[in-house]
Amino acid sequence: MKKTFLIFFIFIGQLFALDLNFNTFSSNFTQIVKSKNSTLSYSGHFILSKDQAYWSYDTPSKKEIYINKNQVTIVEHDLEQVIFSHLDNIPNLNEIFKKASLIDKDKLVAKYDNINYTIKLNQEQIQSISYKDEFENDVIINLNNQIKNPKINSDVFKAKIPQNYDIVR
């Protein structure tokens, strides 16, 4: 599941960097992951810059994810732990969008690494991204309250790590 989250974060960050003209971007999101036996729903907000991302999950549990290029820090409040990770296999999203096809004025499809992505637009803004992940889960991410180029304090991209949390590397 963590790999699914990380691929999505990198995907959305690169999507906005390549497809929309902006320096920073923020949005609220809901993410629904459906497997054969269950459906999980997540919500929160994210802030992106060209090289960094901050994701805050509010439900079902509080979690923050900080991405700086290919370095990832995940603060898991329910587990009182912080996970440091390095992404070696980041999808080549330039290739995804070179191969993307406009199905109609509000829908794009792209295939990369045997994963098909559907991107739905509304008035040239991304409304949702859906795909089937490597575990055969159906993933739908809906965006709302999108803001292009908000002023962002760079401190938002620095992980806030409580002293009593366990560190996992």
Curated annotation (Swiss-Prot):
Protein name, UniProt field: Outer-membrane lipoprotein carrier protein
Keyword Transit peptide: no
Predominant subcellular localization, coarse grouping: periplasm
Chain segments annotated as coiled-coil in the UniProt record: none
Signal peptide: 1-17
Entry keyword annotation includes Signal: yes
Quaternary structure, from the entry: Monomer.
Pfam families referenced in this protein's UniProt entry, alphabetically: LolA
UniProt-listed SUPFAM superfamilies: Prokaryotic lipoproteins and lipoprotein localization factors
One GO term (biological process): protein transport
GO cellular component: periplasmic space
Originating organism: Campylobacter jejuni subsp. jejuni serotype O:2 (strain ATCC 700819 / NCTC 11168)
Family membership: Belongs to the LolA family.
